[in-house]
């Protein structure tokens, strides 16, 4: 066994010490500027995946040139048919990695979904940088948080172009995923490095410049370690074609440096990495110094005869500068690694420069050798410099100059005879005449960057190991690990293969040291106890083959949220066995620990413990007691010498003595005196007593024993067992009696009744013999007592303590429980055989623990030293910290294999197609006509396109049952334009063309028929079925020409029949009522007449465009007017219903001119069995331009809540009675916290006497007294905010109330307290008083708290100051409860109440009048400007826009910055439409805002303000537990102070309307919106307050506006909305909602839609229950799977855990786009690659799968699959 000690063993052997022990200072290097290369890695063409393989390739003069892998250019062949011709003429040969796409994303915790959005250069650089660190022997985790620098050469953006040009599929992660900076930044991010992290683009000089930057960072003290390198990946043909055009590329795809046939370079790919340190630091750290960088330099070649032309003078300058920095004579440099790109101009120029610097004046027989790596591996461009550098380092290390590849004849344009340089043409030993090996490295960029470095060997060599090959001092530990379990076998195989081949000459001790001290220890670990080299090979083979081995441990560390600290448990009597110490007394550490005790004990009783251990003669109880202590002291020393230390200690019986010593409470000598003198006393009672282990809890056993004192429970072992002690015969009788009852008992090997009254007679003698011998102190390690009633008691271990320890019960259960409560989960039983491990296991399981370990130190009759290592191995594999350097202080082996990657191909599948406009349809033409493809040999042709939300061929919104569909007008326009026909017959609209998912669409024209077909585009192209998935949507027959229409409409005659003049918006309102909330096109009716069977409507297809201004779409499109025709045509029927066109007998177009902007629709109801109409499109001159004949409609069954109706969009908040729970909440104690003493007293007086209560005047007073309160299950903290007398006090009071509640929540969550927190408010819902206004933000805050921390508590809005105990107990799971009329109620969204509908005579309330002024706060914000636009559209002519920012003077508007241009443009547009726009710079939240606003209104002299819109707001999302007071107030102020300022300036009834912009986020509990939700809840209550005073005040509780404002749709917001069960709205839908609410006498309107839920999917927030709809069926009342189904859910136990684990892993896998097998149940989801957007998606997936509502913070509080499984199991149990 390894040992840190160097003292002599009893056998006389000594342990080896490494050369360069910690005492060595290396003072001669302390002030050196030298930088050491301590690690190196590479991956280049030819399978050269490490420097050693590369070296062999160099010696063999191999060239890795080959054809480019076909997949690289495949997308370009598909993109455009023309590309094939050009690609055939593009150089396709070069030096390529075999599988560039391979990446081990799981190792780095990156999901496949994110990985495919990462440039392969980032991926390969991550792996190669990791390999370099392993080669350096630097555990990556040891650099976490350090100033380590990363500099990386990179200048290829092929992958970026490939993925970013696929515009429809661009995703958020592609930005950093394809950026140059992403390469070094990704390395820094993964390793958590805080030093410089920079991408270097200096073209082909990039990576040598990166090395230079790394050297400088170390020399300047910026970083202690630098990871430097370069990478190149060739993913596309573009740059290769450029270089072909420039003549830079070799036509045969190979590099021929220095050869006469050199005619261009060949591109190569790969990566190289170096790890750098200062030489002094490297030596202190005992690093393997591969080479020393003496000097480096970078310069630019200035203005040459072309930016890409090489410059010999600049190359000489760089070399001379590097030599100068190194202070080295160029003649001492034996080898120069040249850039040598194989170009006709470049090679001679470079040789000239090298010759001038290194070859000048050299003797012919002493040349400077030169070479270049490029013919071997190609020109890696940005990675070229580092690869040349690596070659130079290898040559220095090996002492051999490798021969040049691809060299047939030296370049005749170079005068080699006088150059003083010589190309290495065969492997050449480094000349022994050189006192030190030195080399130069050149690298140049085609933009003019020139770089050079000078390196040399490091001469001190480590001495050979005195133990010789394969020897090891006793057994040792071989450690392996990986982020996933499956890696362990692979790592074992890799190491075993290496040990039997190239590693066979390495010392096993060095290998073990390397794996323990120079490698990371990941979460999955294997630890193998091995005897020698051969044994190590065999055990590794067993692990690789999945075969168990006695001394092999394999497990995962405890969960990330579980403490890895270790509790040492020293057990008592019963662990002894004869040979337990025979081996150990020969261990120097063990021997040194017990030898002083041996002398003391011999002096006390005349016996030598060491001799007893040698002979095994210690059967008597007195000797067992002494030797138990001695062994535990020796084992403790041995464990500590092997790097294990206790973080807490428990002693059991006699084990309490050693426990006290190890904890520092006693000295070893004091412990020896206690155990020895007590053992002498025990001789008086030996043979008289007995003990049995009873398989019953101690309480039950005591009941059986009764009150007798001669037979007692001596040890409370666990919740299910105890030990009984007493007279020997009585114990035997009791055992028999218990067996008769069916109770199992086991005899304890003891003849003394320890811890029983039979020892009472020994107490005083023990006091006497220990008197004045002990000087106990407080322990320095946490020490739990098993002798005291309180296991955490801090009593000194004095004489009285040991008197009690001898006779009192051993309370092991309580001690272990206390340790568990304090967070400990790892227990090490320090004994010679496990005595209490089983009991500890039982206690842990009884406490509900699942992830824990109880580990024995030794086992009876097992090799002791091996088993001690085995116990350390088990601790290590469960995550305990081990100081491996203490156990393995020797040298380390530099050749041990690095990580074996588990690669999977990851490559973004690009949806490529021709780039010309024919690929996809032109949305502005309102058709689905994409690329036209004729079918050869037929008269059939097909238009093919892709349809999704971004390519919908209409400008508006056209939802049906919550799903966007293409309007019928768009399909008809498609047929007309696609056929060129003027007539369609028998148009059958079969299935709507939905846009809810991407689909391929084809318009097929065949003879006289035309149809639209489509199929969904699957996420994986392999899932595409060529035929089966096509759906036919619409069909028709067509004719190219139609006879011109002679029909004309006599408007006067028609109007004379149409006696009823309708409101202009009749059809819009009709459609709105039946569920059509939005139009696909922006037409409007400006005149409308009807009778029973006819209609005449004047239609403007775009009223926003005035005069002759061009339309915003293709002017030839008939779709807008046809959409008006189909829509108005459906409103002629007397009974409103949701209808859509199903069949049209004939569609005719009678003109070849563009359709007019304004036309008339003449509609006639037809006589038919189904609703049918004829519609003519008529010019203003009365000419019939187009006609629908017999347009038949089918009635669509409306689905409440998901159709496009206003009823599904605008809701009220209703308060139906709450449903009580069956099981009430237990409330035993109520803690009242309120700043208002009177209110607090009133509430307290309402409590029944059976409930304990405590009162505090502030949260701080409560916190100060918390330690003395029963903060346990059954306790509720009730926060009661105070009263407020005036509106002036409201802002400050609101801030105080919300922060007090936040403090209470943080205190509860941070303390993991099982209490509930209730908030009681005073009639907020009525909104009548300043108190209600001040407390109202708590409404919003409470809902967000309930969302982030479910089941923590509830806000109850009460009518009277009475604690609503019944409500608190029985109304569970609600976020807000309102008590009205004594009834507890919870909130639900419901349709607007009909009794609130205003009489038609009153007209809408919330619309402007031309004569008034309309004020908008946040007026220059996106939403503020949209409101301004809407108000102008509805007639407003004077706007006052209030904003914190001012606009520049109008004269400078044409020169404003880009960010202001949209604002200026919008204001100019408003003014062009006749509005007068005034901008007032004013912070409405400031104390003087009222005065400033009033003064400004007087100054401006505008007509009186008739309407106010408060749209100002600030959003700063933070989780409840992370929010700060300042950040919270920053969001609250614009909402509260701003609204109150407006309230004061414009009191109730002084304006026509007072509109406030709130959010639905506080109603559904948007995660992170505690502050925003609080502010909006205030606005909601202020609206109620004003409305009760007779004001037209409304709070709009908006969902997200699509693409606009603070809630603008993003991937995260969309996912959050989806998870809450709601959708966003368009701008038009929002203002349609405004107009709809204007018809009602309401003080609020919730504007959102419920999405359609899957069958059985839980409703995520209960407030949606009444408006939520399902696609199929209704909510299932069963648990996640129907009873009796094949997927029935197990009810409990391991089966349920396995079921949930499988289901949850499946959900995670679906989100991450990986297999379920690759999801580690115990890995943090963040480590698997789950980001913030994916977290929301995962919640939805879990809800769909397990049919249980998931709170937003679940994955934060339960960060692994295992944690989630526990949570779901608890929910299922309920």
Curated annotation (Swiss-Prot):
Keywords: Antibiotic biosynthesis, Multifunctional enzyme, NADP, Phosphopantetheine, Phosphoprotein, Transferase. Residues 1059-1202 are annotated as: C-terminal hotdog fold. Residues 32-457 form the Ketosynthase family 3 (KS3) domain. It is an enzyme of class 2 (transferase). Its EC number is 2.3.1.165. The modification O-(pantetheine 4'-phosphoryl)serine is found at residue 1732. It holds the Pfam family PKS_DH_N. Residues 926-1045 are annotated as: N-terminal hotdog fold. InterPro entries: Ac_transferase_dom_sf, ACP-like_sf, Acyl_transferase_dom, Acyl_Trfase/lysoPLipase, Ketoacyl_synth_AS, Ketoacyl_synth_C, Ketoacyl_synth_N, Malonyl_transacylase_ACP-bd. Residues 186-238 are annotated as: Acyltransferase. Residues 1-14 have a biased composition (Polar residues). Residues 926-1202 form the PKS/mFAS DH domain. NADP(+) binds at residues 1419-1424. It comes from the Eukaryota. Residues 1403-1450 are annotated as: 2-oxoacyl reductase. Residues 642-676 are annotated as: Acetyl/malonyl transferases. Residues 1698-1772 form the Carrier domain. This multifunctional enzyme is a polyketide synthase. It catalyzes a total of 11 steps by seven different component enzymes, in the biosynthesis of the antibiotic patulin. PANTHER family: FATTY ACID SYNTHASE, SYNTHASE, PUTATIVE (JCVI)-RELATED. Homomultimer. This is 6-methylsalicylic acid synthase. It comes from Penicillium patulum.
